């Protein structure tokens, strides 16, 4: 059973509310997001692009641009090597368009997920050399490509790295020894010597900052770099970066830009997803548009997604966009089957004792391993690796919980992998098939997770009676957007809510509506999108079958609930009303 926690962070909420013209509840939520002090609150509410740090603070940023501008002047052949996910596609798009604007002789290559794997490899370096490429520029990859970059340097090539992933290291007797490549310049805010104040940038944001420095260097108006702000925002949300600090500013600016997008490919994708440009928010980036871009890298080639955004003909853009949507539909079906198989294995093969799950699904397409890992992590609240058979052994992806730094834990058994990399919350790996069971054993031996770490935790912003909620307050919550990682939609809790009626609706009978009455007698319209059968089982066990039947018929009963809820304004036939979405109950 999940534990409910109320955020108890202190501040003078009345003073904050008065100073910034917001309700005390809104002020409390902002404090719960770790925003402290008037300057920080002002940036949270009113942050502008002009408030973000100078990209010149990025270690090697100016050096990279000095080299790149000279290569452009020399008409040297430059190749951008990106990645096959949304961040890699957007990073590549930004650099290709910007370098062409700067007069560069530039092309691009996005690795094939199955044939090439993640990031740089020797094959891609050799192909670039055969094609007469002088300079390789990486984006959203390269920080861990130590051997591959060494190979490129042996061939006499220039290598410029832009990345945002964790810097690889060896753990020698508890001391981290960071690895460095022989690249001519490395730009990554996670480097120890990097003085850039905000570290949580995605690859596209790092690439965009290089564009700003490049335009500054060669005399192009820096304002032109704002042409890419919607791509930066798209990648930031799609790559599940924290929507805090600078990222929050970038995403807000990007959403404003996309409401008036001129990109033919983006317009086509919006049309195929039945979304009006002026209605796009972070949810659409993360859960509708982003998965369509990622689906190409998973099941086909991410080059197709990049071609969509580079496209200048509407007919072609609509064709590609419709293909992306169809691929994503296929991905959804494959994912559902993979999750079902993983659950069967967990329940059959004594995985309950494992604190870290390593599940081998040889028949699952390697591109959806990460999605399946995320679903299994959500179900069991355990760090999860999903492994699958590949052309040269086993590949996999991991998704973690807050209490477990996945990449650091993998470093403790790095000898088992042929390749690995990632973040605290996610990772990718390759290993020989004979190491699969050993990996499961070792990663669990090293895990120091406690029983409490593995209990799901529900964080409540404010314990607030539903009676306090008003249309005005819910409307005000829009100042908290965009919502996403580290800035979730606010949730509240109330108790002693009596169920007067409950009934199932929806085309697939997968939505539960409830009429509730507060302890003060206020009638409430509520909705629940979770597991309805589990909810019904709880009601029967806790209150009895008679009460359950009475509630379904709208008759008096003894069912009283405590709920975690999120209020919103429901619009039906142009009429607005308050609706309470139940997240959890007990």
Residue positions per predicted region:
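Catalytic domains of riboflavin
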Residues: 1-3
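Short, glycine-/Ser/Thr-/acidic-enriched flexible segments
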Residues: 85, 142-144, 166, 191-192, ...
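Active-site cavity-forming subdomains of large catalytic enzyme subunits
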Residues: 126-204, 208-217, 227, 244
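Hydrophobic helix-and-loop "lid/oligomerization" segment in the mid-to-C-terminal part
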Residues: 5-135, 154-156, 174, 182, ...
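Short helix/loop capping segments that flank catalytic or ligand/cofactor-binding pockets
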Residues: 89-90, 147, 170, 245, ...
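Conserved beta-strand positions in the Rossmann-like core of class I SAM-dependent methyltransferases
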Residues: 107, 160, 539
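Mid-to-C-terminal polyanion-binding domains and interfaces
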Residues: 70-74, 316-322, 326-360, 412-586
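Short, well-ordered strand-loop elements centered on a beta-strand within folded domains, enriched
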Residues: 175-178, 183-185, 392-400, 523-527, ...
């Amino acid at each position: 059973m999940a534990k409910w926690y109320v955020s108890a962070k202190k501040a003078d909420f009345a003073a904050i509310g008065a100073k910034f013209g917001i309700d005390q509840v809104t002020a409390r939520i902002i404090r719960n997001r770790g925003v402290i002090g008037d300057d920080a609150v002002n940036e949270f509410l009113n942050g502008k692009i002009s408030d973000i740090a100078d990209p010149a603070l990025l270690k090697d940023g100016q050096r990279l641009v000095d080299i790149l501008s000279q290569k452009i002047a020399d008409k040297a052949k430059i190749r951008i090597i990106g990645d096959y996910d949304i961040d890699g596609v957007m990073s590549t798009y930004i650099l290709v368009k910007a370098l062409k604007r700067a007069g560069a002789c530039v092309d691009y290559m996005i690795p094939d997920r199955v044939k090439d794997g993640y990031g740089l490899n020797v094959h891609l370096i050799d192909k670039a050399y055969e094609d007469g490429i002088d300079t390789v520029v990486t984006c959203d990859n390269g920080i861990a490509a130590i051997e591959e970059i060494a190979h490129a340097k042996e061939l006499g090539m220039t290598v410029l790295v832009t990345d945002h992933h964790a810097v690889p290291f060896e753990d020698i007797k508890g001391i981290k020894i960071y690895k460095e490549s022989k690249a001519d310049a490395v730009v990554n805010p996670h480097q120890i010597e990097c003085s850039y104040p905000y570290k949580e940038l995605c690859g596209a944001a790092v690439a965009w900052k290089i564009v700003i420095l490049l335009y500054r260097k060669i005399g192009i108006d820096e304002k032109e770099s704002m042409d890419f702000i919607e791509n930066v925002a798209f990648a930031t949300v799609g790559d599940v970066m924290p929507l805090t600090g600078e990222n929050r500013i970038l995403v807000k600016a990007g959403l404003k830009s996309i409401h008036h997008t001129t990109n033919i490919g983006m317009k086509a994708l919006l049309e195929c997803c039945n979304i009006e440009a002026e209605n796009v928010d972070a949810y659409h980036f993360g859960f509708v548009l982003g998965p369509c871009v990622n689906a190409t890298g998973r099941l086909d080639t991410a080059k197709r997604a990049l071609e969509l955004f580079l496209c200048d003909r509407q007919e072609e853009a609509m064709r590609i966009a419709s293909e992306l949507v169809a691929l994503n539909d296929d991905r959804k079906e494959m994912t559902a089957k993979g999750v079902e198989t993983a659950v069967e294995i967990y329940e059959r093969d004594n995985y309950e004792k494992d604190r870290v799950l390593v599940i081998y699904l040889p028949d699952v397409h390697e591109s959806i391993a990460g999605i399946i890992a995320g679903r299994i992590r959500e179900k069991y609240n355990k760090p999860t690796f999903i492994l699958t058979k590949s052309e040269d052994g086993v590949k996999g992806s991991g998704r973690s919980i807050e209490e477990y730094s996945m990449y650091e834990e993998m470093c403790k058994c790095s000898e088992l992998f042929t390749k690995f990399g990632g973040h605290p919350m996610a990772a990718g790996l390759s290993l020989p098939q004979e190491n699969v069971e050993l990996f499961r054993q070792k990663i669990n031996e090293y895990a120091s997770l406690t029983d409490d770490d593995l209990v799901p935790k529900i964080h409540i912003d404010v314990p607030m009676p539903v009676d306090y909620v008003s249309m005005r307050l819910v409307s005000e919550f829009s100042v908290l957007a965009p919502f996403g990682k580290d800035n979730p939609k606010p949730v509240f809790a109330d108790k002693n809510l009596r169920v007067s009626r409950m009934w199932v609706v929806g085309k697939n009978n997968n939505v539960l509506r409830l009429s509730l009455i507060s302890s003060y007698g206020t009638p409430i319209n509520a909705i629940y999108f979770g597991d309805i059968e589990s909810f019904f089982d709880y009601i029967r066990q806790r209150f009895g079958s008679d009460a359950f039947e009475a509630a379904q018929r709208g008759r008096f009963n003894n069912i009283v609930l405590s709920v975690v809820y999120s209020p919103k304004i429901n619009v039906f036939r142009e009429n607005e009303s308050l609706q309470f979405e139940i997240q959890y109950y007990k």
